[in-house]
């Protein structure tokens, strides 16, 4: 089994990324090997935590492999629109959600179209995308339009106005900073079966301490090699945007995982990454303050001092 490279000096020893590498090593060497939904198999531990200080623009962007932060940012901005269709992502060359609607299309139609050809049809045919590009009421739908129902008479109910949890959190951070209810929840039990994938990063909570905004994200299921680098970035970016919108300084990001795992077919990536040492510290500049948290654009974000080591890839388990 691989062992994590050891920090060469006291400065390296304090680098936040050693937490990530140690978690990866622990899963790969000591995790429980188990069957999973995808059929690929995982090594898994239950219950993990990482902490990261967002002060001075610092961001949890891995240096031991290249993380495509613009892709992760575009996904977060897409969540905030409430969209559940992959077409806006496809048109930005964001590929991370393509496999799920493609698998559904092949399963339901029997047409064994190649993934690239399916994605090209999503991009070029709006009607096709409307029918086959939707993921069900995932993430953003729950975040900004959580469904409500109201009595319509005769024991029937009709759809009521949706709840914008993100807007509510912005308001509560400004009006009642000491509240323990600054929460964005994605786990809508009534709609899980209609989602392409139930939310993995399911719960976000925010906490004001002095003039700093802390963020916590709980992830019920975490692919540490491919998913977690994106999830850390997304949670940190959301915390940074909320801090700017509500007038606080960025505080600490706390990540908590439930079933935290590595897929058995990710061995080459794991071995390669565990042989590397973290270095440097990427920082995020937000170049303007939009009117609302829903008005950020990818051009508003600038990363400086990011010098990652080479990209590492592995197959996505669907």
Annotate each predicted stretch with a short phrase:
Residues 2-318:
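Terminal, non-catalytic protein-protein interaction segments that mediate quaternary/complex assembly
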């Amino acid at each position: 089994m691989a062992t994590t490279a050891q920090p060469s000096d006291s400065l390296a020893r304090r680098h936040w990324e050693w937490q990530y590498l140690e978690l990866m090593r622990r899963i790969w060497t000591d995790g429980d090997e188990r069957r999973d939904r995808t059929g690929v198999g995982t090594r898994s531990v239950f219950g993990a935590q990482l902490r990261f200080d967002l002060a001075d623009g610092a961001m949890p962007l891995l240096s031991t492999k290249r993380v495509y932060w613009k892709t992760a940012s575009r996904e977060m901005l897409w969540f905030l629109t409430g969209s559940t269709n992959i077409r806006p992502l496809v048109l930005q060359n964001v590929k991370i959600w393509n496999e799920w609607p493609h698998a559904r299309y092949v399963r339901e139609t029997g047409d064994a179209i190649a993934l690239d050809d399916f994605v090209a049809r999503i991009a070029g045919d709006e009607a096709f995308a409307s029918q086959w590009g939707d993921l069900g009421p995932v993430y953003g739908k729950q975040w900004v339009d959580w469904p409500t129902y109201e009595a319509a008479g005769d024991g029937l109910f009709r759809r009521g106005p949706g709840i914008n949890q993100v807007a509510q959190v912005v308001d509560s951070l400004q009006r009642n900073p000491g509240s323990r209810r600054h929460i964005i929840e994605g786990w809508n039990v009534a709609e899980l079966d209609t989602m392409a994938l139930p939310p993995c990063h399911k719960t976000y909570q925010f906490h004001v301490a002095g003039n700093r905004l802390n963020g916590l994200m709980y992830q019920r299921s975490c692919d540490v090699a491919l998913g977690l680098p994106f999830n850390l970035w997304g949670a940190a970016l959301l915390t940074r945007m909320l801090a700017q919108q509500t007038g606080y300084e960025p505080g600490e990001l706390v990540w908590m995982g439930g079933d935290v795992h590595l897929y058995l077919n990710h061995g080459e990536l794991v071995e390669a990454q565990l042989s590397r040492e973290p270095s440097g510290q990427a920082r995020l500049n937000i170049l303007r303050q939009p009117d609302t948290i829903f008005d950020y654009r990818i051009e508003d974000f600038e990363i400086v001092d990011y010098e990652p080591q080479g990209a590492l890839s592995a197959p996505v388990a669907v």
